[in-house]
Each structure stands twice: as structure tokens, then as C-alpha cells.
Amino acid sequence: MYAKLVFRNAKRSVKDYLVYIVTMTICVTLFYAFLSISSSYYSPDIGSEYDFTLLSDGMKIAICMITLLLLFLIRFVNHYMLRRKQKEFAVQSIMGMEQKTIGRIFFAETLIMGMFSILIGIFCGVFCSQFITAMLLTAYGEPYEISWTLFPDTVLLTVIFFVVSFFVVGVFNTRTIKKTKIIDMLSAEKENEPELKKSRFIPVVVILFLMFTLWELFSGIQNVRFYYDSRFVFPVKIMYWGNILLPVVTLGWAALWMLKKKKIAFQKLIDGLLICSVLHAFLAASVPALTNQYYLPLHGGILNQYLVFVLIDLLFFICALIYLASSLIVAWKVKSPEHRYKGENLFFFGQIISKLNTTSKTMTLICITLVLAIFMFIAAPILTGWSSGYLDIRSMYDVQVYSRYNDVYEEENLPQDSYEIITDFLTEHKIDTVYDCTFNLYLSEKDDFHNRQKYDFPIVAISLSDYNTIREMLGYEQISLEEDEFTTQWKAIATEEERDSFLKEHTSIMTDAGELTLSGQSYYEDPIGETAYNSYTNVLYVLPDNICEKLLPVIKNRYITTTENISYENARKLEKLFTEKYPEQAETGAIYGVRFSTLQINSSIANNFILQTAMIYGAVVLMVICLTVLSLQQLLDAGQYKYRFSVLRKLGAEEKHIGKLILQQLSVWFGLPIITAIIVAAVVIAYFIQTISAEISAYIGFSTLMLQIGATMGILVILLICYFISTWIIFRRSVNP
């Protein structure tokens, strides 16, 4: 009998479960699509030089960890269904059915709908997995062909995860129904969150904000004490002193409110702190920009500290703005009677203000989560583009042997080996070479050998013949120098300002073989790999061969290109042999290393793909959670809204005006957290881009970055439009007579 009741209720309540089904279907689709490439049955043709195991295992771990966020979404959507059916449960209890039985019937209904969602989701996931496969094969540079395949282990893992989730949430729902009183079920629709003004949420946020402001004050004082110089330009002076004076003003305003809190309303305190947080966020965000522009002596730790300050100020801005939103609307309504009494605006203001007063905490959390989701969407292409561009610099040669003398303090212990173990292995495995260049890097002056200060390492030099050999390997034109000339080679990460400043100060250099003057062609920027430079330097001297013969060689490198790509298995074997003979830290203090383009590309592509898919998947999950919560917050109160709009109809309001009211209400409800999140995320992303602007310029390019950001924002807009339209349709049906 109960089985028939379950199926009848499920069939009758399909419309009520529509949001539940849609949300669960999206979750299952995403889970299956992203996890499909970790299947043991998935074997793309990516060539012998790649190993797919690293990517497969990493994807499985990353996706499963992020998917734990879906437990919250499943729980929230179930709570929505629980609230929606409270009256029905109350009637069943009054008719004599045990609440334990009611809970089990509800669990069975949600399980049926959940299994239906799993079936649809897996079917849709098969289609979506084609996009993931296309991304993967594009990353490996392989052609893509559509192939419709259902992976049994991925299907099993998907079913197990979601069924277990349904059971866990179902147990909690059953216990909730069992413990809920009938009178509470009947009045459930009238319950709201406590007003934010009466909760402890905002006072706690204010106290934490003031504590962090005190930290900001101490940091500003410390930076002025150790790094300030009266000769700094005016913008830098404002930055230094502003990061002291503004925290003082913030703390002073809070102290004034404490002394006169009977005369000054708590809302006025929040007003002042909101303004201070905005000003200080911009001041803190100016630190990396001014540091890069004027070469300020602020290290990475300080820049990271100010990133934390920016985040703190922006988080408080979100909390304060949402808290003040209803007050701002009330103030506008009071001061603008022409808007207040126009059409049905009085009804509209009442709807928005009452909802904001009772759901501000939820709106704040949604806004913060949206900021995180947007940042993940934007940061994913930046980080992967940075890594991919850096990979091109790191893997320019099939075999790259390099050394360092950072911990060598005796000249006889300097690296001077020719690394013949590489030659023997290549000969044994019949791997032919196209180019093979073993070369030294020299100190222009022997006295610089003991200079080991970080970021003040001496610039090393390469002979003209070795430099031309490397250029020939990479397909660049040969260069020439006069006997008393030198030129420079620069890393891609070096800025134009840094290069111009260096060349202006080094029109000539002293060497142990005499003085050299800067060539007419003073610099070259064609990338030759990062191991051709000394530690912590971005420039390399190119000197005539006869000069280098009289200099001290401190680094010995070897670059090889082969006729065919070295297989992954052979690269691993040779790497093991090399590290056994040349440990990373030798007893002499010399540092040795070897890089194979096969291994570099394999690990970088795998890590980049895992990072990109995990961040995009996580961002989509967070976005779906936020938009679902925003949607359900409106639909949960559909019963109350139906009565309110029916009263409005009886007062003579036209259906056209009611439709406009619904559109306005949903626009404010979706627009407030989303616009706030976009503004805050824009500041965070701008700060993030500013701190790594040199890397973006060198490895990605700002035009490419803008295209990636545009595509990302397009995805966000599509998600928003889908949820907004769905909510509008369901809401309109709910309030119709």
C-alpha cells in the first residue's frame, strides 16, 4: 500500500520536484562528465611520450573532493522540498499516519526523483564528456574525434556517490519530520530567518574587522619605519602614510561610537566603517602597483600581506553593504515620494525590504561564494596560461642538463663534467641527435665568485660561439661581435623598464680580460631557456670567445635536440641514471639537474589540465549552489506571495503590472548579490593580475587573457540567464490564480 502511495505522490508532485530534478540532473551531469576521463576504460591516443596515469589519478581525487560541496546543495534542495510539503505532512499526521512513516515515504519520493535525475544526468554527462575530452586532446596537441562511450566504472562511482548522498540526507530528513510538531508543520511557511539587525552576525563581523584594522595599522607603521624614504614621489608617500592614517581614522570612528553610542545609531557606525573599508581596499591594492612602477623595496611577504588586507576590507564591504541595503531602500523610499507612490512601487518596496531584513545573512554568504566562484573562473585560464607559457621556456630542448654553483666555495669544486652518461644512453637506445651543445657560463670578474647575496648574484657570460650554436638549435639568426664588444640576452620575464635601466647603466663592463663596450645591437630577447642564466638574474652577457678563454667558468650545461621525441619510459630511465651519478646536491656543493621535454610536457599538461578542470568544475558547482539558493529563497515563499498578489489583483492591479512587479523583484533579488560580487571580484582580480603582470606579459599576453576572461564571463552570463528565466517561469506559475 505504501509503495503505491509513494509512486502516486511522486507522479502527482512532479511539478513540485521540478527544481529538485533539474538541480540534481546538473550535479550528476557535471560529476560524470568531469570524472569520465579518469575511467580505467578511457584510453585516448596521446602517443608514447605521454603517461596518462598521473592525470587520471589526479582528476579522480580533485573532482571527488570538490563534489563534496554538492552534499550541501543536495541538503538545501531537500530542505526546500521538506518546507514545501509541510502542510501535506501535517494533514497526513492528523489523519493518523505516524510521522516516522511520513518521513520514510518522503525519503522514498526523493529517492525516486533522485534516481530519475541520475539516469538523465548520466545520459547528459555522456554528451558533456565530449567537451572535456576535446579540452584534453587539445592540451596534448592531438586531433579530436567524437566517440560515444559509457564507462562502467564511472557510472558505478556516480551512482554510488549520489545514492549514498540521498541516503545520508534522507536519514536527516526522516529525523526532522519525526521530531517536528504538527503545529510547526502548519506554520512552517510563515517562518523566516531572524532579522540581521537582531542577530549577532554583524557585531561579530565589526569586532573582527576592527581587530584586522589594528593589524593593518601596525603593518603600516612597520613598513614606514623600515622602508620609507623622504625622496619617494608623492603617490608613494600617500600609499605609505595612507596605510597608517586610514586605520587610525577607522579605529577612531569606532572609539567615538563607543563613547556616544546612545546618540549615534549602530547603523551610522556601519556607514563610517563601510566608507573606510572601501578607501583602505584601494590603498592596499595600490601597494603592488606602486612597488612594480617605482621598484620599491617591498618583498613578496609584504605584498601577500596586503592582499590579505584587501580581501578583509572587501569581505567587510560585502557584509556591511548587504546589512545596509534595506536601510538604503527605506531612505530612498522616504525621500522620494514621487517614486514611492508611483504605480505599485509601494508594494514592491515592501516586498524587497521585508525579504532583505530576514535573509541578509544568506545573501551575504551567497555574495562571498559568488566572488570565490568568479575568481576561480578568471584565475583558471590565467594560472594555466602562465604555466603553459612557462613550459615553452622550460622545455625548449629534448634533453637539458644544467648546474649551479650556489653552494660551491672552492674553485676546484666547480662543475666541469661533460655528462657523458647522456651520450652513452642515447647511443645504446639508438636515439639520434640533431644538435648537441656542451658549454660553460663564465664570471666576467673572478672576484664575483664569492658574491652570494640573494637577488645580487653576479651576471654570468656565454661565449659567442656557444651562443650562436644555441641560436642555431632554436632556428634563430646568428649574431656577430667585435673583439672589444659585448651584448646581452634577456629572459622573457624581464620588463622593458628593467632592461632599459640596466643598459643605460652598463654601456661598458670590466672583465678579467679587459674592458668591453656595449654593441650597437645591445640586447636580444629570443627565448633560449631559463637555465642559461645565473640564479636570481634576468640577463646574460654574450662575450667574444677570446675573452671567455681568460674568465672563470662556474656553470657547465648541455643542451640536446633529438630527431624523434624520447619516449616517456626512456626519459624516466635516463633521469634515474643521471640522478644516481649526479645527485641534486653533490658533496662538492654543486647542484645538478636534468630536464627532458617529454617529462616536462607530460607533467605540466597533466597538472595544468587537473588545475583548470578542478577550478572550472569548482566554480560551476559554487555558481550552481548560489543560483539555486537564490532561486529557492524566492520559491520557498511562493505561498505567501500568491496571497499577496491575489490581494493586489483584488485591488485592481492589471496582470501586465503584476508581471512587471515580479520581474523587478527577481531582478533586485538576483542583481544585488551578483553585482556586488562582480564589483568585489573585479578588485580582487585586478590586484591578482597586477602582482603577476610581468608573468602575464611574458607567458600569456594581455590580449589572450582578455579573450579568456571574455569567454569565462560568457559562461557566467549563460548560467545566470538560465536560472533567472527558470525562476521567473516557476514563480509566475506559483502566484497565478
Regions found by a protein language model. Name each.
Residues V14-Y20, F106-C124, V159, V163, ...:
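Selective transmembrane-helix segments that form parts of the transport pathway or gating/packing helices
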Residues M1-V28, L196-R200, W257-C276, L324-L370, ...:
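N-terminal Sec/SRP start-transfer signal
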Residues Y390-V624, G701:
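Basic-flanked hydrophobic alpha-helices used for secretion and membrane insertion
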Residues T29-S40, F76-Y80, M113-E142, D153-K179, ...:
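Small-residue-rich transmembrane alpha-helices
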Residues Y50-L68, Y140-V168, E195-F209, V233-L246, ...:
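Conserved transmembrane alpha-helices of multi-pass membrane proteins
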Residues K15-V22, A33-M65, Y80-R83, Y228-N243, ...:
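Peri-transmembrane interface segments
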Residues T29-I61, M135, A325, V371-Y397, ...:
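Alpha-helical transmembrane segments
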Residues L5-D16, I26, F72-I112, E189-E195, ...:
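Interfacial "coupling" helices/loops that link adjacent transmembrane helices in transporter permeases
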